[in-house]
Amino acid sequence: MSKQGDDCYFYFYSTCNKGDNCPFRHCEAALGNETICTLWKEGRCFRNVCRFRHMEIDKKRSEIPCFWENQPGGCQKSNCAFHHTKGRYVDGLFLPPSKTTLPSPPESADDDLKAAQITLQQNKLSVQSNPSPQLRGVMKVENSENVPSPTHPPVVINAADDDEDDDDQLSEEGEETKTPVQQPAEENHNGLRIISTRKSNADTKQDDSLNFGIKTLEEIKLKKQKEKTKKQSEGPSGVPAHPLQSRTVPVPEKENVRTVVRTVTLSAKQGEEPVIRLNIAEKPGKRKGSVADVSGLPLKRSLAERLGRKIEVDKAPRREKGAKPAGEIHVKTLEEIRLERANQRGETLTAPQAEVCCKVEDPSSGVRPPPAVRIKTFSEALAERKQRRLEEEKQKLEEFLTEKRAEGERKKQRILPPSVPGKVKLEEPTRKIKPLEEVHIKTLEEIKQEKALRMQQSGENVPAPAAQPGPAPAGRKLLRITKLAAPGKEEKKTVELSRASPKAVSAPAEPSNQSAPNSKAQVKSLEGTVKEKLQLRQPEKLKKEVAAVPSATEETVKAKCKVCVKPSDSKASTPTKRALKRKAAEISPSAVAAVKPLSSTETEEPPAKKAALTAAPALPEDSLLTKPGVEKPPSSLELQLGSQADSVEQSGDSSSASASSQSVAKAQQLSSTGAGKAPLSVEDDFEKLIWEISGGKLEAEIDLDPGKDEDDLLLELSEMIDS
């Protein structure tokens, strides 16, 4: 807050909220004073307390009534500079009303302005209520002096009327081109035009002019433009009649000319109506007259050409049909049209696609009108194509399925060789247990390879000495060798891939007969095993190979020794225990899948295999290659194989019994060292029970070490088989 300088506007006329921080002057002595300090104007006022104002005052606030005086609280400022007509109390002090009087001349001027505005509004209302052309001209002349602004609506309308009148005069005097259709209409309206020019002030004729003149200027101008374009396009056809009629009207009277022009435009409108009616009525039928031909036919031809229809052939029958009354065309109901469409759809479904083009031209000779044909070609043709495609796809799918079924039956017939009857009998229940996808996995090439290998091996009577050379294995592979238990019955074991990489080594299977050792090996190709791995997941295959064991074996397994099946990709905690238990499980023949610890599913066997397990040779003690002292990482695997498979197969029941006792003793040692939980008597009972159920059949499992090359593995296999 400063005591010098310019005044604070809010301090003197309102309230300043800044207080001492305000840079402008706050002076109590100058409150309510409206006199400007002359020294401040010159810049020489250095008084601390100056009673005069230090700001430019351009308003006489003493003549302006105070706003707060009329409010409920009243004006509460003791030094209010505005005019007060009433006395007021401020802080207990009575302040009389202002001595100055408000000036009266401005009020009278305002009254004059208000009166002028009222008269103008009345004039506007009168002009709007009487929109006849004569009265418009008169009101325009009378009100042109009083209208303050040129944007007044009646002025705009009258100015447009003047321009219109000038255009009408020029068109009547200069241009002599009128259509012959309009001339009789003008002659018909001749009497109305003459009466309207002579008796324009009569009320009845004013009503007529009101009815005819209600149309806006834009509509009339549009009609005139259309008439001019028609005249220019058609040429001067009706020259001599119209100028005579226009000369009969006195030109200098503007009002008369205006009414004549309005009636002429109305007659032109009435003259145009029959042409439009003719066009609408004769659109579906014959074209009569040159005007209708000019307006209607080129559009129809262009549409027909767009649709690709033949114009010359189809036009004549269409016109003959159009000669019928219009009611016959519209007689058809929705149901009839739908029935026709349904019939045509049925025809198109049976007929090939080449008939679609013919359908566009055929309805010209039939009963149906052409618009329905157009609808048919666009929307329904697409629907028909979609239906055809769907039907073709369905037929292709059905043919494909029938071909696949026929191929499956052929494969089954090819798989049935006369030399191996028992194998096929046991293949069917295993396939019933497995899902249907396994039937479609094997290709023809794989089946042919298997058949060729079987024929070759049965001719040579030699078990598969070496597997097909493949890439080096990156993970664990399980190759199962199954032996015949009883004559005429045999188990089929598929090669199980228990690693993630899609490479496989074929599994030699050694079926044999006790009476005559017909040893055959079933070798699956690399592609077959890879596809089986990709399409059948490992856990599902394990669960389906490990089907239900008889109830007696389940109870004994649960009660005495928990032998668990584990997917071969998972890792065990202790490698030594896993290896030992794998060897122990190798001797117990009831397990079909790889037997490993730390898993939930227990060993089971399908009942179809139980019938086949009657008597089988056992592996001797030295056939197991065991390394009990060496610890391996969980990924390392041991190679385990029954080396003397052929000699054991060819031996009799006596040798099998002696070998079985040795293997039971070996299994007893392995299970006691590996598990270390069950006592020896329990394990003896368990081994005896399994031996009784299996009938002496053994299954050897080969675990291939991924660290070795294929050549080394094949050499070891051949040595074991030869020994």
From Swiss-Prot:
Pfam families: zf-CCCH_3 (PF15663). Residues 511-522, 637-649 have a biased composition (Polar residues). Disulfide bonds: none annotated. Residues 142-208, 223-256, 404-428, 450-526, 565-681 are annotated as: Disordered. Keywords: Coiled coil, Metal-binding, mRNA transport, Nucleus, Repeat, Transport, Zinc, Zinc-finger. A zinc finger (C3H1-type) spans 2-29, 31-57, 60-87. Residues 160-175 have a biased composition (Acidic residues). GO terms for cellular component: nuclear speck. GO terms for biological process: poly(A)+ mRNA export from nucleus. GO terms for molecular function: zinc ion binding. Residues 609-620, 650-672 have a biased composition (Low complexity). It is found in: Nucleus speckle. Residues 376-411 form a coiled coil. Through its association with TREX complex components, may participate in the export and post-transcriptional coordination of selected mRNA transcripts. Binds RNA. This is Zinc finger CCCH domain-containing protein 11A.
